[in-house]
Amino acid sequence: MLSKCGDFTKMKTKISILDTTLRDGQQSPGAAMSYDDNLTYAKMAEDIGVDIIEAGFPAASKMEFNIVKAIANNAGQSVAIAALSQLKEAQMEACANALISGNGRKIIHTYFPVSPDLIKASIGEGKIGHIPSLVRSLFGKFSKDFDIQFSLEGFSRSTIDNSFVVDLLRAAVESDVEVINLPDTIGGDVFCCGGS
């Protein structure tokens, strides 16, 4: 199936390596690391040339906030440090506060659910109309000092012609978001270049 997508060896653009071990990877049972282990891992990832390290979810706990802040402060100019949040101002503010004194490029990676089940569980049905304007407002506020990465959580389970998803994508593009992710968040619905 991947052959339908083209020959990746002939790409002329640089491919950036994003390491989510410190955030997503530690969700696996038995994979949790200490404060010092997080900093050591981040330094090793930077030393081998990782371009972006997603360091954590600062709003989750004081420890997580301190880990992200220390990684951002210790990082060199060659690596970008990302912090994750939901599309909530207080969580994005926690990311900003953890990253602001960092040395290199800083990324706030925020997400919002777009599959019907995740929307229902997260904010309830019928409460999504204001979300595109919230995207514009929050991204406008934070994009002055940070790159913004936006993930549409559960995208593969949303309806492709869903006007809400289109409105969210439009709001993100109009807000000059650096990266837009369309993930298969919980698996089972992966598609690539026309696959099913």
Which residues does each predicted region cover?
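Intrinsically disordered, low-complexity segments enriched in glycine/proline and serine/threonine
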Residues: 7, 29-30, 57
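Short active-site-proximal "capping" loops at secondary-structure junctions
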Residues: 58-63, 86-89
